């Protein structure tokens, strides 16, 4: 009887370990940080939730986008997206093409929206366009 209970406990412990590993590997925040460290593109977004901001990383810079809806009548229609970064000093290496790529990726998800950039990003875009 004791051996049977011990086997059940070990089986439950093994199942919990597998669950914890899968949950860790599938964590989107961990995947975002990994993509940021490898300077890849990755986006975390809940398209059905208009109140939740999205995060994206591109070339090692983490951006955040705030979705704006025009009125409460259309809760699923995104009108404007305001994008900013906490580290504008990393934008020195960005070209105008990089900002266009980010806009394309966002517009793939929200085709009828206008993208507003934060002031440091606007300045970096204008400096690159000159």
Swiss-Prot record:
Q: Which organism is it from?
A: Bacillus subtilis (strain 168)
- Main location, first listed in the record: membrane
Q: Does the keyword Membrane apply?
A: yes
Q: Which residues cross the membrane?
A: 2-22
Q: Please provide the record's keywords in A-Z order.
A: Membrane, Transmembrane, Transmembrane helix
Induction remarks: Expressed under the control of the sigma-W factor.
Give any Gene Ontology cellular component.
membrane
Annotated membrane topology? Single-pass membrane protein
Source domain of life:
Bacteria
Q: Does the keyword Transmembrane helix apply?
A: yes
The record's subcellular locations are: Membrane
The UniProt function text for this chain reads:
May mediate a negative feedback loop that down-regulates the expression of the sigma-W regulon following the activation of sigma-W in response to conditions of cell envelope stress. Might interact with and inhibit the activity of the protease PrsW, or could bind to the anti-sigma-W factor RsiW and thereby protect it from PrsW-mediated cleavage.
The molecule here is called Sigma-w pathway protein YsdB
């Amino acid at each position: 009887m004791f051996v049977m209970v011990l086997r059940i406990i070990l089986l439950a412990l093994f199942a919990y370990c597998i669950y914890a590993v899968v949950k860790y590997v599938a964590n989107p925040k961990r995947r975002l940080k990994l993509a940021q460290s490898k300077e890849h593109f990755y986006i975390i977004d809940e398209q059905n939730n208009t109140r939740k901001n999205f995060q994206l990383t591109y070339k090692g810079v983490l951006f955040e986008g705030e979705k704006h809806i025009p009125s409460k009548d259309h809760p699923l229609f995104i009108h404007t997206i305001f994008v900013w970064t906490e580290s504008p000093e990393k934008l020195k290496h960005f070209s105008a093409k990089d900002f266009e790529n980010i806009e394309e990726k966002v517009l793939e998800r929200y085709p009828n929206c206008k993208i507003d950039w934060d002031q440091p990003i606007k300045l970096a875009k204008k400096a690159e366009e000159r």
